[in-house]
Regions:
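Conserved phosphotransfer microenvironments
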Residues: 51-69
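C-terminal output helix
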Residues: 107-116
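CheY-like receiver
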Residues: 123-143
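Alpha4 helix (beta4-alpha4-beta5 surface) of REC/receiver domains from two-component response regulators
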Residues: 62, 83-102
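Conserved acidic segment of CheY-like receiver
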Residues: 1-12, 17-21, 49
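Acidic, metal-coordinating helix/loop segments flanking the phosphotransfer/catalytic sites
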Residues: 32-48
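His-Asp phosphorelay/catalytic-motif detector in bacterial-type signaling
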Residues: 47, 72-80
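Two-component signal transduction core modules
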Residues: 49, 102-103
Length: 143
């Protein structure tokens, strides 16, 4: 059975994510603080980790970077990570944290479900809602 860790200090975040995926036959492990993620990962060996960007004690990006460092030093296998983002600036930080996906708050359960399924298959999933807007070149606006 595949396992997903959901790490968020806000109960509503954990509830909304788990509700969207609970019928997929996945074991869901909930964690309240970023510092609790690494020990649980070592114990449970999950298939996916979902981190709230604003998680207490250790933010989502810092937790993601810690997990990547552990994997790079071969103390952990590589495990896909998704972040739950609040605002457009978070996209930049999520990219810097080298996560395989992200979800945007307020959550869309269909997107969460689709994203979790993609990430568990080894694909990436990026909700494009907060992506920066690309404007046409300045000279093409004149005319």
């Amino acid at each position: 059975m595949q396992q997903v860790i959901i790490a968020a200090d806000a109960p509503w975040v954990r509830k909304e994510i788990s509700s969207a995926i609970e019928d997929l036959g996945i074991k869901i492990i909930e964690v309240n603080h970023g510092v609790e993620v690494l020990p649980i990962v070592k114990q449970e060996n999950p298939n996916l980790i979902i981190l709230d960007f604003q998680i207490g004690n250790m933010g989502g990006p810092a937790t993601a970077l810690e997990l990547h460092l552990e994997a790079e030093s071969q103390r952990l296998p590589h495990i896909p990570i998704a972040l739950c983002l609040d605002r457009r600036a978070d996209v930049f930080l999520a990219k810097r944290a080298k996560v395989e996906g992200w979800f945007i708050k307020p959550f869309n359960p269909i997107k969460i479900r689709k994203g979790v399924q993609a990430l568990l298959k080894g694909d990436s999933y990026y909700d494009s809602y907060l992506e920066p807007i690309t404007l046409p070149p300045k000279n093409s606006l004149q005319g």
